[in-house]
A protein has these predicted regions:
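Active-site scaffold of zinc-dependent metalloenzymes
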Residues: 99-129, 167, 173
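Short, well-ordered secondary-structure micro-motifs within conserved domains or adaptor modules
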Residues: 80-104
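Surface-exposed patches in mature extracellular/periplasmic domains of secreted proteins
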Residues: 70-86, 146-157
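The catalytic-center signature of Zn2+-dependent metalloproteases
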Residues: 126-201
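Active-site-proximal beta-strand/loop segments in catalytic clefts of secreted hydrolases
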Residues: 42-46, 85, 91-95, 118-121, ...
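Disordered inhibitory propeptide/activation segment of secreted metzincin zinc metalloprotease zymogens
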Residues: 15-72, 103-109, 183, 188, ...
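Extracellular/periplasmic catalytic domains that process cell-envelope and extracellular macromolecules
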Residues: 31-34, 82-84, 104-111, 126-127, ...
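Bacterial N-terminal signal peptides
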Residues: 5-14
């Protein structure tokens, strides 16, 4: 039987929170460049036994795929390296919840940032591809999206159909075929690249 593909709003993509102190403008200190970004990817302590057993493999798969995914998402304008001493920490949390970018301050100044990526959505254990998209989305929040036409760090307009371009919507429009994992946007749009200061090759 031919698989039927349809659009849906994925909760895992819409479960995105950025702390209020990131509003109303982008964070600038310490300076992080989307052109040369480094990420420390690590495993958190949360999760049931099955998910904890899955986390090392998820970490390794995401670490292997994220540099290429970032280069593709930025149209070749950005480079990403996986390092222990990195610009930003990304934690894989083995529970359900709201994936989010959090900034940590000392004396009113930003000293570090952390992203929590939850690997479970309801009863579903998310795939590497889904977690990659979530990670790209949360990394995008370092710079995007602010000002007119945005709400809570996302574009306020809603896509009318699926497109692989445009990562900074909430909820995010994805497609899914029967028996397959969802396919979601993987490329930053021109206006997202502009927010990230990546408008020139």
């Amino acid at each position: 039987m031919k698989a039927i593909t349809f659009a849906l709003m994925l909760v895992f993509a819409s479960s995105c929170g950025v702390i209020a102190s990131l509003r109303p403008g982008p964070t600038i200190a310490p300076l992080i460049s989307a052109r040369f970004l480094s990420v420390h990817l690590f495993i958190g302590d949360n999760g049931d036994a099955q998910e904890k057993a899955r986390l090392p493999g998820l970490r390794d798969s995401i670490a292997g795929a994220l540099p290429t995914a970032w280069a593709t998402a930025t149209g070749g304008r950005g480079q990403l390296a996986i390092r222990t001493d990195a610009d930003i920490d990304v934690e894989l949390d083995g529970t359900g919840g709201t994936s989010a970018l959090t900034q940590h301050k000392l004396g009113g100044k930003i000293v570090s940032r952390t992203i929590a990526v939850h690997t479970v959505e309801g009863s579903r254990r998310l795939s590497v591809a889904e977690l990659l998209v979530t990670t790209l989305h949360e990394l995008g929040h370092i710079w995007c999206c602010f000002g007119p036409g945005t709400k809570d760090g996302h574009w306020s307009d809603t896509p009318t159909s699926f497109s692989s371009v445009g990562l900074m919507y909430s909820p995010m429009t994805c497609t899914v075929a029967a028996g397959s994992d969802p396919v979601c946007p993987t490329i930053f749009s021109d206006r997202e690249l502009a927010e990230m200061h990546l408008t020139a090759p």
